[in-house]
Amino acid sequence: MSGKSFSVWLNNEYLPTHPEYSWIKEVSSKATKHAVECGCTAFTRFFKHQSGFPKFKKKDISDVKMYFVKNNPKDCYCERHRINIPTLGWVRLKEKGYLPTTKDGWRIRSGAVSKKAGRYYVSVLVDVPDSQVKSKEDQTEGIGIDLGLKEFAVLSNGKIYKNINKTSRIKKLEKQLRRAQRCLSRKYENLKKMKKGESAQRANIQKQKLRVQKLHQRINQIRTDYINKTIAEMVKTKPSHITIEDLNVKGMMKNRHLSKAVESEKFYEFREKLMMKCHEEGIELRVVSRWYPSSRKCHSCGCIRKDLKLSDRIYRCSCGYIEDRDRNAALNLKDAVTYEIA
């Protein structure tokens, strides 16, 4: 079913016989079409075994999104402190300076308003002006980045970025999250007793559910902020190129002992944001194959150690070369000659 045929069916057949859903007409017509497209994508991913069966999203409870597009020149006009959204008008932004403004030459194509943990967020899709893409002047030597679980990232120049999940800040929030989840579970058990007619305490589930959502959102924001600051510091040195490894994250997630640690590192988000930032700064991003022996190869003589174990944190070669395992891998990635440009 195309978007046009869906609109004809919705307006001429469904809504006249279902007046309780008349609120659908309050939003943009393209927003309803986009919702059907998202549903089609969800079922496609389900049949490809990429995700679970799609769940119904109730508009007043679930973390749902409202999609909008630019229909005329006056729509989607963004200023530093507010944005003009179709059917809503001017909406004030709490955090200023995050969205690209129209006066600076950015052209907004579409956007979405989402609700997460009791807060509303807006994201936009824009056309990047040519003046924003920087030239390749005054660049320094290239760097290699080795991502891992012990340390988040080890650079070929010796810079080490710690694992944010091992800090006391994250551990304290995760401890609060575990307690909040246990409390929510007990409330659901009390609700079952109340339905059976047994004596139980009144369960205020929605408030506790919101507390759990806020803790999840807080932890996620701390990790995302750390990734953004790490990438900004890497790109600030203006290297001629940045080389990373194409990690097999899907295979790493199959290890039940490491899956939680791999998921919390957010390697895919790091790669996508690094790719975007390198494009803005005019830096070449090189991606080396996952089969490249970056950790097993000696950076001094090129010999490959086949007996290297994961517990061996210091790389020792027969030629006398001794180096930290992750630093050796980062140096090999920097000097790799077989790669793809992202």
Model segments located where?
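N-terminal cap/recognition module
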Residues: 1-5
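Acidic carboxylate diad motif detector
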Residues: 6-116
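Positively charged, helix-rich recognition surfaces that bind polyanionic ligands
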Residues: 101-104, 116-342
